[in-house]
């Protein structure tokens, strides 16, 4: 009986530890650049229904190709870019906008109290299937993943995903179409 109980306890602990390890993933670049980009692109490719992205600067072709492939599988994708990225060299906005299932738009930050300037949309966030969220300091550029000191964090936290989704929807309503 003791052996059965010990085996059961071991399996329970092993299952909990494994489930907990898959709930959160944290990368520090440039040290874990390969793992971070692989996790991000794999997460995109595993999406089933929808991907919501708010990203300040997005020039990384590998990530753009993963989004194109996801859209080809029928995944609906919304990407909010900072309004200043409309004319940015190498931005993926024009490339991704032309694909079915990908909607891109531009968002400007709030107007300063003095009315003289606007803030920026400086998020670096991806929400996949209202289930997984990725957050970090890194823009989606080759330089950010390979040379900069940046972070990328993934979690399945229901509360975090729900809160981020709420604010993403609000930002999306304020977004102006990319034309």
PLM segments and residue spans:
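Sec-dependent N-terminal signal peptides
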Residues: 4-13
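Sec/Tat signal peptide C-region and signal peptidase I cleavage site
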Residues: 15-19
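HKD-type phospholipase D/PLD-like phosphodiesterase module
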Residues: 20-46, 69-179
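Acidic, metal-coordinating catalytic cores used for nucleic-acid/nucleotide bond scission
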Residues: 56-62, 84-87
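Beta-strand acidic-aromatic groove motif in beta-rich domains, primarily in extracellular
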Residues: 64-66
């Amino acid at each position: 009986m003791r052996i059965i109980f010990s085996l059961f306890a071991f399996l329970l602990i092993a299952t909990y530890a494994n489930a907990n390890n898959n709930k959160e993933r944290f990368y520090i670049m440039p040290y874990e650049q390969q793992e971070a980009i692989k996790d991000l692109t794999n997460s995109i490719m595993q999406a089933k229904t929808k991907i919501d992205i708010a990203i300040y600067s997005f020039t990384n072709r590998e990530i753009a190709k993963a989004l194109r492939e996801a859209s080809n599988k029928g995944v609906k994708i919304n990407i909010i870019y900072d309004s200043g990225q409309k004319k940015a060299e190498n931005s993926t906005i024009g490339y991704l906008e032309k694909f079915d299932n990908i909607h891109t738009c531009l968002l400007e930050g709030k107007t300063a109290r003095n009315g003289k300037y606007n803030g920026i949309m400086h998020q670096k966030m991806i929400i996949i299937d209202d289930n997984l969220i990725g957050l970090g300091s890194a823009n989606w550029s080759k330089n950010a993943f390979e040379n900069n000191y940046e972070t990328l964090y993934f979690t399945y936290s229901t509360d975090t995903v729900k809160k981020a989704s709420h604010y993403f929807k609000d930002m999306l309503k304020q977004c102006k179409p990319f034309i």
